[in-house]
Amino acid sequence: MRFKHGSTLYAAAAALLLMSAATGAARAEDTIKVGILHSLSGTMAISETILKDLMLMQIAELNAHGGLLDKKIEPVVVDPASNWPLFAEKARELLSKDKVAAVFGCWTSVSRKSVLPVFEELNGLLFYPLEYEGE
């Protein structure tokens, strides 16, 4: 199978499938849920709304080509509203309540620091859209 567009999403989706199978998150259903955790309101909305739109576009493209191993990707979009503590709350909701296999989001360092304990506790998988400045 050869992909022309959105190769990052495809690689991430493949990794997500392997991780979900390894962690027991793979389901017999016809969809794989993924969380989208970008601010759609508040001060960061101007930068992050387009990232949400891009993810939805890439997911639609992937689904139009048959999905991932014959399963459709189902996005679950939440708005942490540029509120750093709310990022952790929304991440917990995505992983625990919505049972997503992975989350795409957390553009800022402070949002990633906010969600890190949640992802570690729940053994979640986070893909963030830029290089980390590191520590």
Listing of model-derived features with the role each one plays in the protein:
Residues 31-33:
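Residues that mark the start of a beta-strand
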Residues 29, 52-75:
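Signal peptide-proximal N-terminal region
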Residues 10-21:
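Bacterial N-terminal signal peptides
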Residues 99-135:
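Extracytoplasmic ligand/sensor domains, especially the bilobed periplasmic-binding protein
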Residues 23-28:
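Sec/Tat signal peptide C-region and signal peptidase I cleavage site
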Residues 35-56, 78-85, 107-110:
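Extracytoplasmic "Venus flytrap"
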Residues 81-101:
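Short, well-structured alpha-helical segments in soluble
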Residues 1-6:
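N-terminal secretory signal peptides that target proteins for export/translocation
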